[in-house]
A protein has these predicted regions:
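Bacterial N-terminal signal peptides that target proteins for export
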Residues: 1-9
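Glutamate identity and glutamate-enriched acidic tracts
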Residues: 3, 35, 51, 58, ...
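Sterically constrained small-residue positions within well-ordered secondary structures
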Residues: 4, 13, 23, 80, ...
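A structural "domain/chain start" motif
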Residues: 8-69, 91, 125-127, 158-167
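Generic hydrophobic/packing signal
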Residues: 10, 20-21, 85, 106, ...
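Short secondary-structure boundary motifs at beta->alpha junctions and helix caps
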Residues: 44-48, 117-161
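Short, low-complexity, polar/charged sequence segments that are solvent-exposed and flexible
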Residues: 49-55, 106-111, 143
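Surface-exposed short loop/turn segments
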Residues: 66, 70, 75-121, 127-134
Length: 167
């Protein structure tokens, strides 16, 4: 009896999953990768790369908090489905002297593109700085929160070649 229930529910899930996936791509939400990648060409000090292992984690959450139209997805495959909208974002530069507290201001640059049905419809570059009496990684997390808020506002009225942040 239990095996029949398990097999039956598995079959229903398998049959329904293509429809659920298709609905998620067209429900009007903008897909954003749940971890922001660092560009392969990014200018980031080696000690910051090594120490700040969570760099890029806060930015997508901040975008989602700032825009009710955003849904986070775990994989590149789910991000770039053929229908609907998705936002690609990558970290392109981090300016941070040393990797400790009290080492001056930290800055982060990101760029992103809004894609709709496979075509870019808008893009941006954004930069923010922060200074606080804390370590480099937590200061950069604050810049991610600020950048996420900027990007969330931009998503309400996205335009090509936009400049965001405090640049």
């Amino acid at each position: 009896m239990v095996e029949a229930l398990v097999v039956g529910s598995t079959l229903v899930a398998m049959l329904a999953s293509p429809f659920v996936r298709a609905a998620s791509a067209t429900d009007g939400r903008i897909r954003v990768l749940q971890e922001t990648p660092v560009s392969p060409a990014a200018d980031i000090p080696a000690n910051v790369r090594k120490e700040c292992t969570a760099m890029g984690d806060e930015l997508p959450r901040a975008i989602m908090r700032s825009s009710r139209h955003v849904a986070l997805v775990p994989s590149q495959h789910q991000l770039a489905e053929k229908t609907g909208r998705y936002l690609t974002v990558e970290i392109t530069k981090v300016s941070a002297h040393n990797a400790g507290a009290f080492t001056g201001p930290k800055r982060m640059k990101v760029r992103g593109s809004l894609i709709e049905n496979g075509k870019e419809i808008a893009n941006f570059e954004a930069e923010r700085g922060a200074m606080k009496a804390a370590g480099t990684c937590s200061t950069l997390e604050k810049t991610e929160k600020d950048l996420g808020a900027d990007i969330g506002v931009w998503l309400e009225n996205p335009k090509p070649r936009s400049r965001l942040g405090d640049q």
